[in-house]
Amino acid sequence: MIEITSTPIVLMIILGVTGMAIPVINVIRKEKGSSTFYGTIAFAALIISIGFVAYQFYSDSIAPAAIFSADVLVDDAFGSFFAIAMLIVSIITVVGSFSYMKNRANPAVYFSLILLATIGMVLIAFSTDLVMLFVGWELMSIPTYILAGFNKKNPISNEAAIKYFLFGAMSSAIIIYGMSIAYGIAGSTNIGEVIQAFAVLDAEMLPLGLLAVGMLIAGFGFKMGLVPFHMWLPDTYEGSPPPITALLAAGTKKAGFAAALRIIILGTIALNLDWTLALGVIAIMTMTVGNIAAIMQKNLTRMLAYSSIGHAGYILIGISIAPFSGLGLQASLFHILNHAVMKGAAFIAVAGIVTTLAITHLDKIKGLGRRMPITALGLVISLLALAGVPPLNGFWSKLMLFGSAIDAGSLTRFSVSPSKYIFRIIQP
């Protein structure tokens, strides 16, 4: 039986119907609509979607329950939280695309692909089955491959799309191989049953369980931008259309964390691993590489790309210390939501700069406050939030993260690094 009124089904209907309708409208209209026309349709669908999820979430109407008889999707608060974060990013992306797509070709296809990618992200958040999760993963990935290279006349954009596609295909192959091993061990693709099977592995099967978890960490780590799976990220962010960079940096990254929390964390607990040490090492590597590389950049887009890598490390720190501090997981979830808003807003400001001035070099954006005061103000606020300056939202989530790290005895010196490159941008 299908619960047609469940959150993921309603979202798929709203976004799917709208996403398919936009190209159809474009074909049957005698006068082709502008980017504003199609963007408004996409924006309305996203607003209705996030309004529905927010109402369900805050009215306590969500009771964890299977949607299909096969238990492949579940309507729960975890999925709704990530759905809200992803829908916020998609809304920011669409709003930022109004000016960027003005006078550009194929706006109907562009906005339709954004909605289809959003469906994939939502499916990932609500999935409780490995097959459904992978379907959502590919539904998110394939539209973003096209969107990354949407500016076909720009060779940098073409290069970005090719790199993103090649690394994305490799990560998908790694994920499906890890899932295949998990299915071979458990005899089921249901995540709950897989975890139960992992919990009772004997010594002979334990290496296979470790291999499955390791491959899933590597595959999902690609989208999350974790070191050493981050090599594609700076070039792809630099070459993609700036609004799409916001979707990649703030949206698909969160989908990666949603998948990781659904599978990897519970899987490592079932294997009785000292998984906190492994995740902590990856988190420290990610923070270090991301922040140091960001300081060295002279291109605003690449700097924000490496900043995204660093913030992925912060989120992972909270997850890794969750067993030792009650605030760890809460802080990570709070920072996931904050980062979605902060990074999305920053890249939309960059989109405005690129559209109006066609520059991203740090030396050339000096005096931006005089030329584009509103855009400059939005960029400064988002960057200060990313740096964790009080009383902005980034400060409170970082305070929770590093407070929980102190409780767990972890190092917190890496919080200083982001301020160095952030203030390079906003200095007069």
Place the predicted regions along the sequence by residue:
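Alpha-helical transmembrane segments of multi-pass membrane proteins predominantly involved
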Residues: 1-428
